[in-house]
Swiss-Prot record:
Keywords: Gluconate utilization, NADP, Oxidoreductase, Pentose shunt. The lineage of its organism: Bacteria, Pseudomonadati, Pseudomonadota, Gammaproteobacteria, Enterobacterales. It comes from the Bacteria. It catalyses: 6-phospho-D-gluconate + NADP(+) = D-ribulose 5-phosphate + CO2 + NADPH. This is 6-phosphogluconate dehydrogenase, decarboxylating.
Length: 468
């Protein structure tokens, strides 16, 4: 009896669609789900596909060619550990487990270490693109043993999204948790992109009272230029979508934005690494405060503040917001890639930043035209400390910073909330400052805690008895 070339565990929408994607490239696929009903449902809904169902773990594992290639698409956390534990009794040394879930990178490092000690290969793989991407071609970020990656690379390259230049959006990221770390930072950048867009929406509504149709037209025009990206493309559609009663749907959606925790993970890691991920971290908090709906409604009746006044010339203000958005986006990506560099140094991953930007160009949620600019910047100078220093981005900062300053000033004066726009200009001004007021903070630390300090005019480390 012939054996299947790869197996997929987990038949929720992402696992199901990845299995169908793999099958559509000519591979035979074994499928398994903890509940028999889910597996039967997938088979019934996809007649004629080369998906072979199995209803016990042992039969599933034994149905695969060796070395076995098993893709896990199960709930991250304890669910992943349980799935691995159920597979291990039937695996042979050299078999490969691929975790395609939204897994915390430290868990991937642990699993890689544990499974390697038992003779198994483990590839922690970030997958971005949602359910449509899983079916038609996602961006894929695999990390783990390089030799194990080579055994699954042919499949991953065939199922990945394809950029405009014909390159598949998959590359070997690095050892152990590197793939899931890059996916985590991708998600943090996604948070930043979405919050910047939300703030632009608030500015255009508050400052110009644009209608939904005008907002859609504005985003359509923006999507044809520097800001061209998946998120701008879907946002223009959102503005004009109506419900069955003829109401604009976005206007009746409750203003509470949920989250799955991946933005928080990115921010927590930045603190561990000492990285100033201010814009991306600032994009997490608005989701939290949005969930305080009852408190906000009550506070709106008690706390005073300015009412938004007209922002002036319509075309001029729209262009200022566009420029502020683009520079804010650049700052967000500069912070994200700076954190990737810090993590690469900390965990010895030897990340290739140009390649990472390349695989974000299609398939994933943050896919955007300007990612090619990031690839170009690292291709020209792989060791650049910060993307803001690359010639293209430096020129944009020169040309667009006044618009960002004007937009933030207008927003503050008119009570419009722009935390990520504000974080963008604060980071930019801090990063370009040769001197910061941190000298006073260090003096305070020495005063109350004898933490010592360095001087600008002398070598050495000093402590002062401040009360003498």
């Amino acid at each position: 009896m012939s054996k299947q070339q790869i197996g997929v565990v987990g038949m929720a929408v992402m696992g199901r669609n990845l299995a169908l994607n793999i099958e559509s490239r000519g591979y035979t696929v074994s499928v398994f789900n903890r509940s028999r009903e889910k597996t039967e449902e997938v088979i019934a809904e996809n007649p004629g596909k080369k998906l072979v169902p199995y209803y016990t773990v042992q039969e599933f594992v034994e149905s695969l060619e060796t070395p076995r290639r098993i893709l896990l698409m199960v709930k991250a956390g304890s669910g992943t550990d349980s799935a691995i534990d159920s597979l291990k009794p039937y695996l042979d040394k050299g078999d490969i487990i691929i975790d395609g879930g939204n897994t915390f990178f430290q868990d991937t490092i642990r699993r890689n270490r544990e499974l390697s000690a038992e003779g198994f290969n483990f590839i922690g793989t970030g997958v971005s693109g949602g359910e449509e991407g899983a079916l038609k071609g996602p961006s894929i970020m695999p990390g783990g043993q390089k030799e194990a990656y080579e055994l699954v690379a042919p499949i991953l390259k065939q199922i990945a999204a394809v950029a405009e230049d014909g390159e598949p959006c998959v590359t070997y990221i690095g050892a152990d948790g590197a793939g899931h770390y890059v996916k985590m930072v991708h998600n943090g950048i996604e948070y930043g992109d979405m919050q910047l867009i939300a703030e632009a929406y608030a500015l255009l509504k508050g400052g110009l009272t644009l209608s939904n149709e005008e907002l859609a037209q504005t985003f359509t025009e923006w999507n044809e230029g520097e800001l061209s990206s998946y998120l701008y493309d879907i946002t223009k559609d959102i503005f004009t979508k109506k419900d069955e009663e003829g109401k604009y749907l976005v206007d009746v959606i409750l203003d509470e934005a949920a989250n799955k925790g991946t933005g928080k993970w990115t921010s927590q890691s930045s603190l561990d690494l000492g990285e100033p991920l201010s814009l991306i971290t600032e994009s997490v908090f608005p989701r939290y405060i949005s969930s305080l709906k009852d408190q906000r409604v009550a506070a709106s009746k008690v706390l005073s503040g300015p009412q938004a006044q007209p922002a002036g010339d319509k075309a001029e203000f729209i262009e200022k917001v566009r420029r502020a958005l683009y520079l804010g986006k650049i700052v967000s990506y500069a912070q994200g890639f700076s954190q990737l560099r810090a993590a690469s140094d900390e965990y010895n991953w030897e990340l290739n930043y140009a390649e990472i930007a390349k695989i974000f160009r299609a398939g994933c949620i943050i896919r955007a035209q300007f990612l090619q600019k990031i690839t170009d910047a690292y291709a020209q100078n792989a060791g650049i400390a910060n993307l803001l220093l690359a010639p293209y981005f430096k020129q944009i900062a020169d040309d667009y910073q006044q618009a960002l300053r004007d937009v933030v000033a207008y927003a503050v004066q008119n009570g419009i909330r722009v935390p990520t726009f504000s974080a963008a200009i604060a980071y930019y001004d801090s990063y370009r400052s040769a001197v910061l007021p941190a000298n006073l903070i260090q003096a305070q630390r020495d005063y109350f805690g004898a933490h010592t300090y360095k001087r600008t005019d002398k070598e050495g480390v000093f402590h002062t008895e401040w009360l003498e």
